[in-house]
Swiss-Prot record:
GO molecular function: copper ion binding; ferroxidase activity
Cytoplasmic side: 571-592
Pfam (any one): Cu-oxidase
GO CC annotations on file: high-affinity iron permease complex
Keywords of the record: Cell membrane, Copper, Glycoprotein, Ion transport, Iron, Iron transport, Membrane, Metal-binding, Oxidoreductase, Repeat, Signal, Transmembrane, Transmembrane helix, Transport
Protein name: Iron transport multicopper oxidase fetC
PANTHER family found in the cross-reference section: IRON TRANSPORT MULTICOPPER OXIDASE FET3, MULTI-COPPER OXIDASE
Highest taxon listed in the record's lineage: Eukaryota
Disulfide bonds: none
Coiled-coil annotated spans: none
Conditions for induction: Expression is up-regulated during iron starvation and is controlled by the GATA-type transcription factor sreA.
Gene Ontology biological-process annotations: cellular response to iron ion starvation; reductive iron assimilation
Residue numbers binding Cu cation 3: H126, H417, H475
Length: 592
């Protein structure tokens, strides 16, 4: 199915004549029926009865007022504006139980903030497991001071994603369960490009286009390339970079790139654009799954859409080598270092969970931001935020290093809300834990972004300044891992936040409708802030001696035993039929 690019991917911005404005959005979040891969029709989450949701275009300095009404009926919802710093508007960031309450069915939440950045972003639900069901889309912020103004003729937006046929509540129930003790993530059913397959994008010969690339998927990173065309990377995650040529890019879930691509001067043929899911992430490789999605640059409507050529190896550009245009130098030595070790393991309910330093994230009874605002001087003590939020309190202005050691055999894209960070070190695969006494020289002008990959059994070091008071999640952006607990909470300058931030009354009304507490510690205790009795916690640890393989063996042994007992019971309850008079009992032997 060909899709007209004007509907999904293209907008031409006369950037020199635009000015900041107040943009109003009135969104009704509803269920819609869609079949984006042409294989399976299913319910998806749309906006105002439409799916895919609209690609948004802002100008730097715009004020956004988005009224979000939950008309789903059977699920709560939320909207996270991915990549926006929300400096001074932490309560508009979007994650439920972190900076707001869940928007219950029938409730309306108003997001009201000013856009202070430019580049490529996206918006998506941050309610548990929800955005892969469709509530996600690209967002682009233009800027008259964009360093590449005048070097391109038009802009295009290309989203990449994986796609599932089952809805997320069903998938999550089986994923986080005793029947999946190894934590094998569900494998997608398809890859999509702009929420479809066989996308066509009309181009004109000789023109240069600025392509905004966004991975809005739940799980799969994708390799992306355009046959017989060179891309020049000029932006990652809202950070403009010096142009770097690339033939292939690796885009993890939540990452964004802007690339300049100059068209050929002839129109005899069209060229394939390919997104290829990284199958290293998958525990199983279904024979029926096409890991690739193809679109085409259409120079000539009458010419064929060629089948992409096979590639002998995936060799993407290494984003560590990118250099920001603004020349921000390496921050000074860290005032505070946070070391996070990533593991996957089972807890007492038999299910597999994800951990930072042995802690799996569990949402508190009171949103963490609301705890900050209602605990007075105790807000500087991590204990009030609950053990399983993995709280880390930062002082304003401190330089912070995040040292992450990946003890897992898979890749992980990690995202920090409220900031971009300098990526000052990143190891190869199987390098083990970071050794501060034995590392290469840090780059003088490090690459910055808000989502970065750690390699299997590898490590990285991120550095940022705590200059944005707020409550900011740091989490894996593979949705399966986020939902199984791979998250921590940075509480940045909490006492400053108390002086400057006020929650709007309509936000409290949303909390009341959802039955969410809005004051006190993580357990909702307002009298004794250090009494966490009743706080939400993870399942108890697994009894000593149990392993994932042991659980599998135990589960199947129990199933086999139950089936055996049922068979015996069924046989024992069956009626015994005596031979009729005059009949001859059967005899299996063959006698003559």
């Amino acid at each position: 199915m060909a899709v007209g690019f004007l509907l999904l991917t293209a907008f031409v911005v006369n950037i020199l004549t635009t000015s900041a404005a107040t943009l109003h959005y009135d969104w009704n979040i509803t269920w819609v029926t869609a079949n984006p891969d042409g294989q399976f029709e299913r319910p998806v989450i749309g906006i105002n009865g439409q799916w895919p949701p609209p690609v948004l275009s802002f100008t730097r300095g715009d004020r956004i007022i988005a009224k979000v009404h939950n008309a789903l009926g059977n699920e709560t919802t939320s909207v996270h504006w991915h990549g926006f710093f929300q400096n001074g508007t932490n309560h508009m960031d979007g994650p439920p139980s972190v900076t707001q309450c869940d928007i219950a069915p029938g409730s309306t939440f108003v997001y009201n903030f000013t856009v202070e950045q430019s580049g490529t972003y996206w918006y998506h639900s941050h309610t548990k497991g929800q955005y892969p069901d469709g509530l996600r889309q690209a967002l682009v912020v233009t800027d008259p001071k964009n360093p590449y103004i005048g070097q391109y003729d038009e802009e295009r937006v290309i989203s990449l994603s994986d796609w599932y046929h089952d809805q997320m509540p069903t998938l999550l129930k089986s994923f986080i369960s005793i029947s999946n003790p190894t934590g094998a993530e569900p494998v997608p059913k398809a890859a999509l490009m702009n929420d479809t397959q066989n996308l066509t994008v009309a181009v004109e010969p000789g023109k240069t286009y600025l392509f905004h690339l966004v991975n809005v998927g739940a799980f799969a990173s994708q390799y992306f390339w355009i046959e017989d065309h060179t891309m020049k990377i000029v932006e990652v995650d809202g950070v403009w970079t010096h142009a770097s040529e690339a033939n292939m890019i690796y885009i993890a879930s939540a990452q964004r790139y802007s690339v300049l691509v100059t068209m050929k001067n002839e129109t005899s043929q069209n060229y394939a654009m390919v997104g290829s899911m990284d199958t290293d992430l998958f525990d199983t490789l279904p024979e029926s799954l096409n890991y690739n999605v193809t679109g085409w640059l259409m120079y000539n409507d009458q010419a064929d859409k060629p089948t992409p050529a096979l590639v002998s190896a995936f060799e993407p550009y290494d984003d560590f080598n990118l250099v920001p245009v603004d020349g921000m130098a390496l921050h000074k030595e860290a005032d505070y270092t946070v070391t996070l070790d990533v593991t996957m393991d089972n807890l007492g309910d038999g299910a597999n969970y994800a951990f930072f330093n042995g802690i799996t994230y569990v949402m508190p009874k009171v949103p963490t931001l609301y705890s900050v605002l209602t605990t007075g001087s105790a807000a500087t003590d991590p204990a009030v935020y609950g053990y399983n939020t993995h709280p880390i309190v930062l002082k304003r202005g401190d330089i912070v290093d995040i040292v992450l050691n990946n003890d897992d055999a898979g890749k992980h894209p990690f995202h920090l809300h409220g900031h971009t960070f300098q990526v000052i070190a990143r190891s190869e695969e199987n390098a083990g834990h970071y050794d501060p006494s034995n590392h290469t020289t840090f780059p003088s002008i490090p690459m910055r972004r808000d989502t970065v990959i750690v390699r299997p059994q590898g490590n990285f070091v991120l550095r940022f300044q705590a200059d944005n008071p707020g409550v900011w999640l740091f989490h894996c952006h593979i949705e399966w891992h986020m939902d199984s607990g791979l998250a921590a909470t940075f509480i940045e300058a909490p006492l400053d936040l108390q002086k400057t931030l006020k929650i709007p009354e309509d936000h409290y009304q949303v909390c009341e409708a959802s039955g969410t507490l809005t004051a006190g510690n993580a357990a909702g205790n307002t009298k004794d802030l250090f009494d966490l009795t009743g706080q939400n916690v993870s399942p108890a640890p697994l009894p000593a001696g149990f392993t994932a393989k042991g659980i599998v063996a135990l589960v199947f042994s129990c199933v086999a035993a139950i089936l055996g007992l049922l068979s015996i019971a069924w046989y024992g309850m069956a009626p015994i039929t005596a031979p009729r008079a005059g009949s001859t009992p059967s005899n299996d032997s063959d006698e003559n």
